[in-house]
């Protein structure tokens, strides 16, 4: 733990100089004749053919995008195509030494990397493995198309696998159901797990943190292989990339992780440096590093073993990969490569290239890597022109056949959302219950019964009231934070892949003491602190989960959701459906909703998460519900945003008779719970507002003789309206409440649906009682911002049913609603 590494003022204040090592730039200088000792003729020709395959594939896409045809085959592809002509040597050189168990992640411009890694995997895998992969992947849909089309050609298994790879990738780009992910991923999200090709990403730099999670998965779960993160030079302007590099370079891997876990992450950050972002020139205009490799010196003391290499020479790239893979296998990662290359095409086919000169493009084209490699082999008499002509013809035939098959609507249909109206709906969630993601013992430090927190909890009362009905004191009652702890600790013992991390998760016990006691039970590699890097926390969780593990990560405050916006809104919720259900996403994100800490630490942003399809969202308010819902979340395979309120971490269980069970149990998502029965008015509450709603119910009953039924939503997505409908049928009136600002809140979504579903039973419009549309004020002023018990009576009186002789203290009239909206508050 950190206190084993005391920080002494005499050490940190002493005068010295920070030293940097020289960073190699294009130091490879071997001639092809010299390299012929390491490669056979077949090796050289395979490198050439793989480069040609990428070039022809990308040229074909450009032709289809600009002319709607290729080699006489007509097709219109309205989707995106970010092409990589010119970058072939970089992709093929990188993939040459990578094994199928090594994983690559890419960007929106990664067709070439997909083909290079796939072709390399095909070369290395045996025929039986390839046959099994093709026949079983998505029930063999893509395989049947290419197998039938090539039945008369007597192809070997490896040759057929090449046809399968090119066709499957193209069918995916063309949004066909026979594509690698039924056309739901498309050009910018294509991948193929059996060959070690992990998701590419349409969000620039998106792989920068996701790939780190994949590397964590390999390290923590002792899986062989390395991870390569392919990003462009433009991505170096993005925060998540820097956060990912920081997370990948944490000192604790080498200082605090123990045993075989000690050592750096097996990840290589490869910058496909084609000199441009979209149109901005990174060197000389939009960035200040001059050489992208320079940034490694700012990340860790090893300077990330950074090197700038000639990506126009496939042998130079292979040489660099050989050296860097050795570094990674020695547990000295991460590694950074600045791979110099160039794209001949624009950012996309519609790019007018107004930001660069034709002379610049011509200069690069004259040094074309494919043509230069061919000439070198001929000059060194390592191959003949006829060899290249045969390779070229084979490549053109493969690409042409792929176009013919992928363009044919009979052979390659699109997903029919007319006849299969629920096809995408079924893919949004996997809805599996998987107690452990892998069946093996869990790494733990002690037996559960020896844990001091477990022993302390055993002495607590698990119900909030004693036999006489008196409240149990807070220091003796089983609290909401204890319920969360029990569910989490149990899962650590049960699922060996589970990791938990975030800010102050270890030693501190979590910012709000939920994790207190875990440090004693869980080894460092399964529970650790991260930098203050919310994007990397969530992004790495995505990568860890899609690799096969389960993650429990934490954002200290809901207000920090914005710091991980892309990762929560674009990455976490979408990959299950974009993969056609192949990927699972067992990630639980704990999000604490604050109070007392003002405008940037006290916001309820549940609506941001409920708005995004693909996320499950829960918000328990009692110890019983917290434990049961957390258990359900950790047993599932879907991403869950698990909101918790800081107001109520210390509450005891007031509703479940008998208290919170010591054994494990689940509460199904989507089922609201009646916390108080009533007959005149329904209150549907979200989160901690439950307790103020219950106070209001007491006031209604005591002062006005109105019987109130209080329902705790518990879960927001999914949500079963049946219990609410039954209540409204009885009461005819309902208030929906929560601590979020009212405008745009999930409360208004609930109210809209209740208005539709209960129209015939409602005696008055549905009332929504949220917080004011202001900044959250100081604690001393919060009673004027968050819903208070008296407000329920005020809004009931002015919007639902007047109470004789009552005068509202807060205005909720229609006039007031119009006034506030005119002002935008």
Which sequence ranges carry the predicted segments?
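Conserved acidic/glycine
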Residues: 1-90, 131-132, 142-145, 152-153, ...
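Cofactor-binding active-site loop characterized by glycine-rich and histidine/acidic residues
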Residues: 56, 63, 67, 72-267, ...
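Glycine/charged-rich beta-loop-alpha catalytic/anionic-binding loops adjacent to active sites
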Residues: 71-77, 148-153, 186-201, 224-230, ...
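Thiamine diphosphate
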Residues: 88-92, 195-415, 499, 517-518, 584-585, 646-825, ...
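General beta-strand structural signal in soluble alpha/beta enzymes
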Residues: 104-107, 182-183, 212, 229, ...
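Phosphate/diphosphate-binding glycine-rich loops and adjacent basic-rich segments that engage nucleotide
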Residues: 597-684
């Amino acid at each position: 733990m950190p206190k084993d590494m005391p920080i002494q003022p005499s050490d940190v204040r002493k005068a010295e100089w920070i030293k940097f090592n020289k960073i190699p730039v294009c130091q490879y200088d071997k001639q092809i004749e010299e390299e012929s000792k390491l490669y056979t003729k077949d090796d050289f020709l395979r490198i050439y053919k793989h480069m040609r395959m990428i070039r022809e594939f990308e040229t074909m896409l450009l032709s289809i995008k600009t002319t709607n045809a290729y080699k006489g085959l007509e097709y219109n592809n309205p989707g995106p195509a970010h092409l990589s002509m010119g970058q072939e040597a970089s992709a093929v050189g990188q993939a040459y030494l990578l094994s199928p168990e090594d994983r690559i992640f890419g960007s929106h411009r990664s067709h070439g990397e997909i083909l290079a890694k796939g072709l390399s995997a095909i070369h290395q895998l045996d025929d039986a493995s390839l046959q099994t992969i093709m026949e079983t992947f998505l029930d063999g849909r893509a395989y049947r198309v290419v197998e039938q089309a090539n039945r008369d050609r007597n192809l070997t298994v490896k040759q057929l696998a090449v046809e399968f790879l090119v066709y499957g990738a193209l069918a995916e780009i063309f949004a066909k159901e026979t594509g690698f992910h039924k056309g739901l991923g498309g050009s910018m999200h294509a991948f193929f797990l059996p060959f070690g090709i992990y998701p590419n990403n349409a969000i620039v730099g998106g792989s920068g943190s996701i790939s780190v999670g994949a590397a964590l998965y390999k390290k923590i779960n002792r899986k062989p292989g390395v991870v390569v993160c392919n990003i462009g030079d433009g991505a170096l302007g993005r925060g998540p990339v820097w956060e990912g590099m920081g997370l990948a370079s944490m000192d604790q891997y080498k200082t605090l992780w123990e045993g075989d876990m000690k050592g750096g992450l097996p990840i290589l950050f490869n910058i496909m440096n084609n000199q441009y972002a979209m149109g901005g020139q990174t060197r000389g205009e939009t960035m200040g590093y001059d050489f992208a490799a320079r940034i490694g010196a700012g990340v860790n003391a090893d300077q990330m073993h950074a090197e700038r290499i000639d990506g126009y020479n496939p042998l130079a790239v292979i040489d660099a990969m050989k050296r860097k893979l050795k570094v990674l296998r020695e547990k000295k990662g991460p590694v950074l490569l600045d791979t110099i290359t160039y794209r001949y095409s624009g950012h996309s086919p519609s790019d007018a290239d107004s930001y660069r000169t034709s002379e610049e493009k011509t200069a690069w084209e004259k040094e074309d890597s494919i043509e230069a490699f061919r000439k070198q082999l001929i000059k060194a008499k390592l191959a003949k022109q006829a060899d290249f002509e045969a390779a070229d013809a084979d490549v053109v035939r493969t690409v042409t056949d792929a176009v013919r098959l992928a363009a044919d609507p009979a052979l390659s249909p699109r997903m029919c959302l007319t006849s299969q109206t629920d096809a995408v709906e079924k893919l949004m969630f996997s809805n599996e219950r998987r107690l452990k993601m892998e069946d093996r013992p869990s790494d733990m430090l002690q037996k559960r019964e020896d844990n001091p927190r477990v022993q302390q909890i055993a002495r607590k009362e698990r119900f909030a009231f004693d036999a006489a009905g008196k409240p149990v004191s807070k220091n003796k009652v089983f609290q909401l934070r204890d319920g969360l702890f029990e569910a989490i600790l149990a899962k650590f013992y049960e699922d060996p892949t589970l990791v938990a991390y975030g800010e102050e998760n270890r030693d501190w016990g979590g910012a709000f003491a939920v994790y207190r006691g875990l440090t004693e039970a869980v080894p460092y590699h399964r529970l650790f602190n991260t930098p203050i890097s919310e994007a990397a926390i969530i992004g790495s969780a995505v990568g860890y989960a899609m690799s096969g593990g389960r993650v429990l990560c934490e954002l200290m405050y809901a207000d920090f959701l914005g710091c991980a916006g892309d990762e929560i809104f674009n990455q976490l919720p979408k990959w299950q459906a974009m993969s056609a259900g192949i990927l699972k996403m067992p990630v639980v994100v704990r999000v604490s909703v604050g109070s007392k800490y003002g405008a940037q630490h006290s916001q309820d942003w549940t609506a941001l998460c409920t708005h995004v399809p693909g996320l499950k969202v829960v918000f328990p308010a009692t110890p019983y519900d917290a434990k049961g819902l957390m258990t359900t979340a950790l047993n599932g395979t879907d991403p869950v945003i698990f909101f918790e309120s800081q107001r109520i971490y210390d509450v005891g269980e007031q509703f479940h008779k008998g208290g919170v069970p010591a054994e494990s149990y689940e509460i199904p998502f989507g089922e609201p719970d009646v916390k108080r029965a009533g007959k005149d008015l329904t209150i549907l509450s979200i989160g901690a507002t439950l307790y103020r709603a219950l106070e209001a119910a007491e006031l209604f009953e005591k002062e006005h003789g109105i019987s109130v039924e209080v329902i705790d939503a518990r879960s927001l997505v999914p949500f079963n309206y049946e219990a609410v409908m039954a209540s409204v049928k009885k009461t005819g009136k309902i208030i929906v409440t929560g601590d979020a600002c009212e405008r745009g809140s999930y409360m208004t979504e609930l109210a809209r649906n209740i208005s539709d579903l209960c129209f015939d039973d409602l005696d008055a419009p549905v009332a929504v009682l949220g917080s004011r549309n202001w900044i959250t004020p100081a604690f001393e002023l919060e009673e004027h911002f968050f819903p208070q018990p008296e407000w329920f009576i005020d809004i009931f009186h002015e919007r639902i049913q007047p109470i004789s002789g009552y005068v509202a203290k807060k205005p909720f009239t229609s006039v007031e609603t119009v006034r506030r909206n005119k002002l935008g508050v």
